[in-house]
Amino acid sequence: SIVVTYWDKNKNFEPIGIMTNFSELNLIIKKLKINGIDTLDNIISGRGVYKLTQTAHNEHPEIEDIQSRGHKNDVGTGVFGKLENIIFFKDKPNDGRKYTKVLGLLDKNREYFWVDTRYITHTPDYTKFKVVLPKANGTGLLEDKPSMMIGAPLVLEPFVAFTETFISIGAFDNEEEAHNALKYIKSKFARALLGVLKVTQDNPKDKWKLVPLQEFNSNSDINWTK
């Protein structure tokens, strides 16, 4: 094919940058850049933030042989199946030890398992409320239902961890703020801006960098009760 390009050498234009088929979205994106607005990716975790500790390996050396090569510390998507009844338990053991509740997948279903608290690292949001959602789900099509674009997000209470299947949003002091954040990411506005960069199933934090960050408490100019 042949491409013919025209330009006006007497004018200086701004770079096109990110462009969509929707004029409203293009205007919002332009305002974000001009005003330097904080965006949601600043409070989203990366993938695989929880890891197995050296204590877990010291007390259960068989873990290294079971885990994939080079990933001995990963709390991966299949960890419940691999390490069930070794360090992860469906029912909380009654042995006097302190255990951490972990959200993950088993046979493609969401499940909670328990692990000795000494066996898993703790992140800054571990003691806080947070919103978790699948790291990969659906597409970025604006026609997608919320569940197709962002999966089925939920609020996790403090002292609950999660496997690499999920990423988390925020580290909130109270449950109300977390539920307000949940409402926001399910809104058409947030999903539309997410869809600008999310064109595949992958849903890492950098795909959210066009979604404006909001105040999720009572100081917000948004009425979260609606």
Which sequence ranges carry the predicted segments?
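C-terminal substrate-recognition regions of SAM-dependent nucleic acid methyltransferases
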Residues: 2-225
